[in-house]
Design a protein with these regions (language model features):
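Short, solvent-exposed loop/turn segments at the edges of secondary structure
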Residues: 62-64, 75, 82, 107, ...
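Short, solvent-exposed loop/helix junctions and linker helices
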Residues: 61, 89-92
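Positions that flank functional sites
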Residues: 55-56, 86-87, 118
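Structural motif
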Residues: 51, 83, 113-115
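N-terminal beta1-alpha1-beta2 module of alpha/beta enzyme domains
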Residues: 1-80
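Internal, glycine-rich beta/alpha segment that forms the wall or movable "lid"
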Residues: 2-10, 91-157
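Glycine- and other small-residue-rich loops at beta-strand/loop junctions that grip anionic moieties
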Residues: 60, 84, 133
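Active-site nucleophile and cofactor-binding loops and adjacent substrate-binding regions
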Residues: 82-90
Length: 157
């Protein structure tokens, strides 16, 4: 979906989604959300982004790659991505593989978003000291960018 500004510039519309809990079963919530994304794809929305949250009522899509692979299979045009993968929770090499696979499954429609996370208890539940979050993020981002942009990956950390 595209609109124009007063001076003629394009505005591309997208959706940011938490896939939050409601009174329905998780299966029904996912089915409803996937139908919504299919509709957005048909209506020419530019992109669909999903949050990653853990152990909160904010989201049941706590595995963005898995959820977005279902989105990719049900759509053909809309761009998609996580906003954000919580880098302190991931092994960077494993995430590189997931990102590449998701980009292939979506036929190049992946929009990659990464971040540190803002809710300390979410990362703490995975044994990550929130005080170490910045350092873990910085190192993971370095490895991720090398892995996605260089022919070989060589990193000691």
């Amino acid at each position: 979906m595209t609109s124009k500004t007063k001076d003629g510039k394009d505005i591309h519309w997208g959706i940011f989604d938490w896939v939050e809990w409601d009174e329905n079963s998780p299966s029904q919530i996912f089915d409803d959300r996937l139908s919504l994304v299919e509709y957005a794809d048909q209506q020419d929305f530019f992109c669909y982004h999903v949050a990653e949250h853990h152990t909160t009522p904010l989201s049941i899509a706590n595995s963005p790659g898995m959820y977005l692979s279902a989105v990719a299979q049900r759509t053909s045009r809309i761009r998609m991505g996580p906003l954000v993968y919580l880098l302190p929770l991931y092994n960077p090499l494993r995430l590189i593989q997931e990102v590449c696979m998701l980009d292939h499954l979506s036929h190049g429609r992946l929009e990659l978003g990464v971040g540190r996370g803002i809710v300390p208890y979410e990362v703490a539940r995975f044994g990550v000291d929130p005080e170490e979050g910045r350092a873990r993020f910085d190192e993971a981002l370095t490895v991720l960018l090398k892995g996605l942009n260089d022919e070989t990956l060589d990193h000691e950390g």
